[in-house]
Amino acid sequence: MKLFGLFLSFTLLFLCPFISQADVPELSRQPPRPIVFVHNDRSKSDPQQVHISLAGKDHMRVTFITEDNKVESVVEYGKQPGKYDGKATGECTSYKYFFYKSGKIHHVKIGPLQANTTYYYRCGGNGPEFSFKTPPSTFPVEFAIVGDLGQTEWTAATLSHINSQDYDVFLLPGDLSYADTHQPLWDSFGRLVEPLASKRPWMVTEGNHEIEFFPIIEHTTFKSYNARWLMPHTESFSTSNLYYSFDVAGVHTVMLGSYTDFDCESDQYQWLQADLAKVDRKTTPWVVVLLHAPWYNTNEAHEGEGESMREAMESLLFNARVDVVFSGHVHAYERFKRVYNNKADPCGPIHITIGDGGNREGLALSFKKPPSPLSEFRESSFGHGRLKVMDGKRAHWSWHRNNDSNSLLADEVWLDSLSTSSSCWPSSRSNDEL
């Protein structure tokens, strides 16, 4: 049985490129890099794959996995190392995927917590101590942003560069582990990102590589993703883990699902409409959106794949004066002007593709020529981005290219919040009322 399971695992890994729901024409890409598989070096009762995520106002969700099913879903925490004056009990789950069975996946919500404060915590009543820092409640606040991570040497370089400078929240617009039905790669990915994801909240949305539909064998989509990466959808009144929102300081961030229904009759559309309507731009001057398949793209890779979603939802984002839209999917970097309905518009969001995390498929090297006048910067390189929101009016965006041991600043721009632009709001909602 073990040999058959091993054979099956490698078979699934070989087949995954052919069963992916994101097939595109052959592209000019760098040669694929081998996967960096991170093995488990802890006991069955020790927590592993620890990561944290925001879970509503002043709360954090701690997720960890144990191989021992007897370990309780508890987290002890406090402001001093080894001294835990808080304790919370959560829930647990597990799942099966053909012959694979996951460990016990624990989700524990802790709080209330103080802003901009370091907490020390222990999971399951055993194992090593971790620490995290809560985001600030006021400006400035900084987000590290990258999509399409995977787990290769490229990925390791990206994570190292991100970790070399402080930030408050990590944003990932889809395509996490690139497990593609090979479930042990989900475990390896969790161990790979734990040094970062256990210290700062990781807020993610799904990409096509999280679908993991397999004919006959597995019809439930996003099974692994939903079990392992529980996001604050209930806290933001969403009925699905595939789309949700959260607030940090004065920034409202919306995570959308490119691979679930998005037409005007869908739950996601109705939720998004209600969510954006509740944002008070006086207290929350910035609105940022993340999704996987880009709505604007001048690369030959995945050309037009986000068009249906753009046609369905773009007006909602435009009418709400969303400031920036981040996407992944295309394994390159590209920054657009403020745009709406395929035209430059000073009241539309800036669109940025940041699908350059380092996955095994390599880079999408073929940009269309001549470049679109809407595209201001584009490059096929691995790297990551940082959005530092200085105050209610100004933010600084920078893209850092991977260059072996260094992280080089390759693109940057200052952004003005649309909440401060009186010309972008109807007279009934003048700037004085924002």
Swiss-Prot record:
InterPro entries cross-referenced by the UniProt entry: Calcineurin-like_PHP_ApaH, Metallo-depent_PP-like, MPP_PAP, PPA-like, Purple_acid_Pase-like_N, Purple_acid_Pase_N, Purple_acid_PPase_C_dom
GO molecular function, one term: acid phosphatase activity
GO CC entries: extracellular region
Gene: PAP22
Top EC category: hydrolase
Protein name: Purple acid phosphatase 22
Domain of life from the UniProt record: Eukaryota
Residues that carry a glycan: N116, N403
Quaternary context: Homodimer.
